[in-house]
Amino acid sequence: MAAAAARWNHVWVGTDTGILKGVNLQRKQAANFTASGQPRREEAVSALCWGAGGETQILVGCADGTVKHFSTEEGRFQGQRQCPGGEGTFRGLAQVDGTLITCVDSGILRVWTDKDKEASSDPVLELRVGPGVCRMRQDPARPHIVATGGKENALKVWDLQGSEEPLFRAKNVRNDWLDLRVPVWDQDIQFLPESQKLVTCTGYHQVRVYDPASPQRRPVLEATYGEYPLTAVTLTPEGNSVIVGNTHGQLAEIDLRQGRLLGCLKGLAGSVRGLQCHPSKPLLASCGLDRVLRIHRIRNPRGLEHKVYLKSQLNCLLLSGRDNWEDEPQEPQEPNKVPSEDTETDELWASLEAAAKRKLPDWEQTQGALQARRRKKKRPGSTSS
């Protein structure tokens, strides 16, 4: 039953307590999955990506340097492998042609054979991409191409099948009006579809577009949003704009053709850690330090669709690309089954709402009685005058 339920989850979220949470938005349920059976902060999930089997497998990068394999078909972990080397947590995770790609804070990018999940053999490739990495991102159209960037670590594009030198190395923007050097802090990266262009968001609230095919290595477009560091960026389904989130829970859509602000989304209360748009539907999934997963509709009518409190601080997410969200079969519940402690529902909030509705008529009756008493008190005074 757990395996069948896991198959239909719409969003997968990695937490600071080492729990992988699967959320079914149609049923308004969230289920917890751990490899050891207990939450452990030393296994905090810092990166997620789909495995070689598409959405039937999830690769879970943990703070202790392990990458776990989770089957969405069976609803359980199927093994793990150690990926040592470098310092810090995983800043990116990807797979291509049976190999696993990892990158950590200290700038060590490694490619591992993924045939034996329990093995801890030496990597088949190691690249030093520079310290202070904030993000490693794979190009969906060319899986052997990855991009890296971080704090005082400018954007670079690497070919894992080519040389150990980057294909593209971004150049910093010109000095500011005081002739002072502009600091570099790339927080997140995305590849634009059907082109070689990339978009980054920075810790200095800038959105920049780079074109490796152009002669210049500086950004071909730059826009700014707000006053706080931008922490995450995702492409909209059309590919002409991006949505960015910052450390104060603000979300905004930026047009990549003109660099102007298209609109904002409300509802978040903490730093944004993960953003992802559905590939075909106008939906945006977001998570962060306020421990709430939110699904926004990004096209008219723009607004909040779903909101799920998940108890732990949320670090990253994966949004299913399925189109048949509403058409999935409702599987029958087993009779007299005690709900699992790992399943979180909105029953409490539903009961509170129902109680509030029951109290509403009593409140109206009380208001009516008070108004009747006031009219009775006013009548003697009005006749005497």
Curated annotation (Swiss-Prot):
CDD domains found in the cross-reference section: WDR74
Ranges: WD repeats: 40-80, 83-122, 128-168, 179-220, 224-266, 267-306
The entry's keywords: Methylation, Nucleus, Phosphoprotein, Repeat, WD repeat
Organism, as annotated: Bos taurus
Gene Ontology BP term (one): ribosomal large subunit biogenesis
N6-methyllysine: residues carrying this PTM: K311
SUPFAM superfamilies registered for this protein in UniProt: WD40 repeat-like
Subcellular location: Nucleus, Nucleolus; Nucleus
Main function: Regulatory protein of the MTREX-exosome complex involved in the synthesis of the 60S ribosomal subunit. Participates in an early cleavage of the pre-rRNA processing pathway in cooperation with NVL.
Region listing for Disordered, in residue ranges: 323-385
Phosphoserine carried by residues: S214
The keyword Cytoplasm belongs to this UniProt entry's keyword annotation: no
Ranges where the record places region Required for nucleolar and nuclear location: 320-385
Protein name: WD repeat-containing protein 74
Basic residues compositional bias, start-end: 372-385
Oligomeric form and interacting partners: Isoform 1 interacts (through WDR repeats) with NVL; the interaction is independent of RNA or pre-60S ribosome particles. Isoform 2 does not interact with NVL. Interacts with MTREX; the interaction dissociation in a late stage of rRNA synthesis is required for appropriate maturation of pre-60S particles and depends on the ATPase activity of NVL.
GO cellular component assignments: nucleolus; nucleus; preribosome, large subunit precursor
Cysteine disulfide links: none
Entry annotated with the keyword Phosphoprotein: yes
